[in-house]
Amino acid sequence: MKRTLFLLLALGLCACGRYGGVPAAYHPLLDAALADCPRADSLRALLHETPRAEREGMAYLLVWMPRGDRDTMRLDLLRENVAYAYRARAEYPWTQALPDSIFLNEVLPYAAVDEVRDSWRPDFYARFGRRVAGCRDLREALDAVNRSIVAEVEVEYNTAREKTNQSPAESMRQHMASCTGLSVLLVDALRAAGIPARFAGTPAWHDDRGNHSWVEVWIDGEWHFTEYYCPPALDAAWFLPDAGRAPEGDPAHAVYAVSFRPTGGYFPMVWSERSREVHGVDVSRRYRDLYASQVEERLAAGTHVEVGFRMFRDRRHAVQSADRVAANVDVFCGDEQMGGGRTAGPRQDMNDVLRFLLEKGKTYTFRYENARGELTEVTAEVGGEPVTVTGYME
């Protein structure tokens, strides 16, 4: 009897000494991840030192983190990240209500893409914890963070930023960032407040007009999109008409969302085109369906009308197809951008006109750079009937 008890105790100690407190499903994954890691012993010790209630989260990161992070990332950053993620889960009812799979993959991760690994969680936990205090649910918390982030971190969009994929600390030091850096800030701010968020974007719009990055949030079992400069509502940012034309399965033009856990695909990063270390999933179909539904609803309601825009060389050459010029055009209503696109060039069909679906009874400004590189504006009042607006490069 004593021998049996001794054997059982010994087996229990071995199990605890290996990955105690970690669900068994992680054990072979941890073995594989740590097999050729130069600091495997340190990571095992870190896992063992992690509070038992947080150990699955630490295991999740160790298993799925990029190899470079596993080999070099500061252990105190890992420890801190896990601690504050679970602290948010204990504090916020909307985080407590999340499925484990969403918490682990969309709240817990320490990075949005491949940015420098910063110690952002303690600072953002304090900053945005104040903003969500008193919020009753996830939607209220999301709105509180999204509307306050610009004032809270004091970072604005600026092409003079040092690099594309800036970390929160890098962007806050410069007070400027690209749309990528701004999206990293928002993802991290939302995660700090226990709100599931992930980085999303496209390498290039369907018309090769440029790339863009934004943020997706998980609410009531579905993904919705927003961005750093808070749009009027979820799934209502200016870029939906472009994202809604993204060709599914096209690595150069599809819309992708980042996943910390492998998906079988990767997130294409225009600032690091050869990298495959950031996992991703093609979400183009959702944007196409959403845009088609929006167009159908607006046309049925009679609140919007189609507005075309053509670009010609100058007023003397504005008749033939050969006179047309391909140019990037953005449309605004006041300070709010409503959309953008690229006009048809001389070799495209004359019926190929850049089109926008705009609300009736408002004045819109179309902005583009002329042949001299100067910002040019064309203003048009949109009534109840379709209209075509013309711009000139010279």
Language-model segment annotations:
Residues 13-15:
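C-terminal motif of bacterial Sec signal peptides marking the signal peptidase cleavage site
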